[in-house]
Structures are given as C-alpha cells and as structure tokens.
Amino acid sequence: MSEGEGQAKNRLFLGIDLGTSHTAVMSSRGKKFLLKSVVGYPKDVIGLKLLGRPYVVGDEAFEMRSYLDIRYPLQDGVLSEISDRDIEVARHLLTHVVKSAEPGPNDEICAVIGVPARASAANKALLLKMAQEVVHTALVVSEPFMVGYGLDKLINTIIVDIGAGTTDICALKGTVPGPEDQVTLTKAGNYVDERLQNAILERHPELQMNVNVACAVKEQFSFVGTPTEVASFEFRAAGKPVRADVTEPVKIACEALMPDIIESIETLLRSFQPEYQATVLQNIVFAGGGSRIRGLAAYVKEKLRPFGDANVTCVKDPTFDGCRGALRLAEELPPQYWRQLGDVSGS
C-alpha cells in the first residue's frame, strides 16, 4: 500500500452545518447527529458542584440553563471575535462537535463546514483558524451551496436556506457562486421568535413570555398565508396554565420574513441570462428549519406570479440536507482541490 493509499484509508470526512441555534453533522462512517450550538458554564460554586466539570456543550447545556451561564458562540450564523472569552466558547463547541464524530487516533480529519452565504473574510479566517486546532483540513463553503450540491441542483436554481440567525439565498449557475450570486439576511428564525413574543404580549400582556416559549409556539404552529388550524397554546399567567389563541400573532411573525426573501429572490432571478429565467423559476428550493413553515411554497409561488409560473419546493430533510451536501462534496472532491471552492486551512 502506498503512502497516499494509506492516508485515503484513514481519512475521516465530516460535513458540518454550523448554525446559530443547532449544529448538524454527518461523517463518512455513518455517524449523524444534531446538537444545540450552545456552551454552558457554571454561574458559581453551586453550579460547579452540580455540573461536576468546567463546561458542558449542546442539548445537555440547554437543559441545565437554570444554573449555567449559557453562551451561543455563533451570532447571525458566524463566529464573533469580540473577546478571548468568545473565541474560547466557540473553540469548546467546535472541539465537542469533532470529538462527537468519534475519530480514530490515526485519522486524518477533513471537514467541509457551512457558513452564511455572505460571511466576511474575517469570519471565515477566524473559523478556519479554530478548525485547524481540531481537524487536519477544513473548507468553508456557503450553506445554500452545500444544500444545492447535495440535491444535484447546481445550475439554474435558487436555494433559500432559512436558519435561526440568517436566511441565505444563493443563485446556482453551474459555477462556484461568487458574492454577487448570494444574499445573507439577518431576518430568520430568531427574528420570528422575537416578533412573535412581542405580538403575543401586545394581545395578551398577562401571559408569562420569553423567546423559548415563543420558539415553542413557532415550531408547533408556524404558517404563512391562510391558516389551516387554530394556534391554541397553553401558556402561563401568574404561574397558572392559560390557553390562548395566537393564530394572528403567528401569522404576523412568520410573514414578517417574507418581503426581504421575495425581494432577494427577484433580484437573483434577474441576474440570470434572460433565456434561463423561466427555467430558474421552476427551481426555487427552500431549506433550513424555516422551510417547515406551513404554506411557504404556495405563498412564495403566488408572490412570484408576476415573473411567471414558479415551482417552489421545500427540502425533505431540512435538519441534515446541508451537512449531507457538505459530506458529499468532501467525499467526491479530493482535499487537494478544495481551494478551488473556497477558503481552506491545513493541507
């Protein structure tokens, strides 16, 4: 066996969709998992005693949030270089993600990591610097491009990836998308949570509300257009259970996302050559957690009617379609060619 063959055999490929709210991972050995993009630290000595370790990552940290200092290292889908502390939090998350993929001691770890479509060069460089500490080779690519690659939709397609921190929109034209082919909006899932919390409190000021409750309402009832059911949810008021109809607040919050998304789709549609635009309209694909919004495809199709008859679809697996595309890219394209696609660290 040659040295090259030995290296290939010991390579572990990872597709990582690093999100503001959740991180999804798939490996070339069949490992597949989702965790909250959160790190928890004890608030005081009592918290340290309860936790029994210096920090905890993911869903476990979120469940212990009553006595932990909860940190989300990703803001609007990118790492924020505010202080050494912020960088340390991000490092703890990334280290945990790679460790959870269960690499062997002699593995060469090669990871493709998704970032928002218009992430800055500084943010990409910071992520790659951190990745270099835990993997041998890392490539950062735009999240909607990862989705398109996984779906074999790389030409005459517009991908709209609605995450928690950002909505990323990408025009795929048969080449690696450039900045002019992509849009990043900061109105996404977290924005809906905030709008929904405010809209509910405007109508029901007696309810005890926070963004976690608003998120639970959104995940159960989110819709745009005409409602198909009453959004009746059990809240708390003065500590007692109270059921309230929040159908209208849910509609208002979810539809608040739509104008910027529609405008961005229209702008990117016009960037295609005119002879391809009718074909592009047949390939509008929504991905990410926001693609679960009921009535989304029909709503967007109607808004795009002035441009022609559109075919709008939502991916079947919004949780893992991004990292699945990243893993497929990692496996199909040898790491020595990754620099042709984007920013790379390592070999």
Swiss-Prot record:
Chain's role: Protein with ATPase activity which forms dynamic cytoplasmic filaments (probably with paralog MamK-like) that organize magnetosomes into long chains running parallel to the long axis of the cell. Turnover of MamK filaments is probably promoted by MamK-like, which provides a monomer pool. Forms twisted filaments in the presence of ATP or GTP. Serves to close gaps between magnetosomes in the chain. Interaction with MCP10 is involved in controlling the response to magnetic fields, possibly by controlling flagellar rotation.
Q: What is the effect of changing residue 161 to A?
A: Wild-type subcellular location, MamK filaments no longer dynamic. Only partially restores magnetosome distribution
Q: What is the lineage of its organism?
A: Bacteria, Pseudomonadati, Pseudomonadota, Alphaproteobacteria, Rhodospirillales
* UniProt keyword annotation of Cell membrane present: no
Which controlled-vocabulary keywords does the entry list?
A: ATP-binding, Biomineralization, Cytoplasm, Cytoskeleton, GTP-binding, Hydrolase, Magnesium, Magnetosome, Membrane, Metal-binding, Nucleotide-binding
Alphabetically, which GO biological process terms does the record hold?
magnetosome assembly
PANTHER family tied to this protein: CELL SHAPE-DETERMINING PROTEIN MREB
Q: What is its main location?
A: cytoplasm
Q: What else is known?
A: This bacteria makes up to 20 cubo-octahedral magnetosomes of about 45 nm in diameter which contain membrane-bound crystals of magnetite (Fe(3)O(4)).
Q: Give the residues the record marks as binding Mg(2+).
A: 143
Domain of life where this protein originates: Bacteria
Name the Gene3D superfamilies on file.
3.30.420.40
What free text does the record give on domains?
Domains close around the active site upon filament formation, which probably enhances nucleotide hydrolysis. Nucleotide-binding also probably induces domain movement.
Q: Tell me what induces its expression.
A: Constitutively expressed, levels remain the same over 144 hours of growth (at protein level). Expressed during exponential phase in static growth conditions. Expressed during late exponential phase in the presence and absence of the mamK-like gene. Part of the probable 18 gene mamAB operon.
Report the SMART domains cross-referenced here: ACTIN
Q: Tell me the subunit arrangement.
A: Forms cytoplasmic filaments. Filaments are parallel (polar) and double-helical. MamK subunits from each of the two strands are juxtaposed, each monomer binds ADP. At cell poles and septa interacts with methyl-accepting chemotaxis protein Amb0944 (MCP10). Forms filaments with MamK-like protein.
Instruction: Summarize the activity regulation.
Output: Filament turnover is promoted by MamJ and/or LimJ which have overlapping function; at least one other protein is required for turnover. MamK filament dynamics are probably required for the assembly or maintenance of the magnetosome chain.
Molecular-function GO terms, alphabetical? ATP binding; ATP hydrolysis activity; GTP binding; metal ion binding
User: What residues does ATP bind to?
Assistant: 9, 20-21, 76, 164-166, 218-222, 289
Q: Which reaction does it catalyse?
A: ATP + H2O = ADP + phosphate + H(+)
Q: What family does this chain come from, according to its entry? A: Belongs to the FtsA/MreB family. MamK subfamily.
The entry's protein name is: Actin-like protein MamK
Instruction: List each coiled-coil range.
Output: none
